[in-house]
Amino acid sequence: MEINREIKNITSAFVLEDNLTECVPYGSGHINDTYRLTYGTGKHYILQKMNRSIFTKPVELMENVSGVTAWLKKKIQENGGDVERETLNLVMTKDGLPYYVDEDGEYWRVYLFIENATCYDMVKDEEDFYQSAVAFGHFQRLLADYPAETLHETIVNFHNTVDRLDKFKTAVEKDICHR
């Protein structure tokens, strides 16, 4: 993506360096618009425009993200881990918020880019699947004593495991793809 005035205005709202040299689409996600920012020092960040069709409560979403990532940082530090690699790190705006709202009402957020990290869209083998489960279990363990009552429900029933499992079973029974 060309570093146009819009991108410069958006990035200038965050506590970032001044010498943005590149802004390119990043990843294969299909919900948010995601870009990798490169600065003159070689440092990278992730810039995301949140999809308001999916995330209709972006302020509440970002309160959740801020709370959970702060909690994870504390737990990771207590365990002697690397907080810049083991959890997302939000970059705040100059106003101290974890998001910026542009003149069109679009919500943007910035994270530190985790160098040399790997993200899989699909598992290649059983080991990948196993390691994903290990990572998810570790994530759950770190959040075991998180005050869940502080979280906002930003997508109805999204984290309701019972509801999701019921919907999955119904989809399997219907087998509309004839698998």
What are these regions (language model features)?
Residues 22-177:
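Conserved ATP-binding subdomain of kinase catalytic cores across diverse folds
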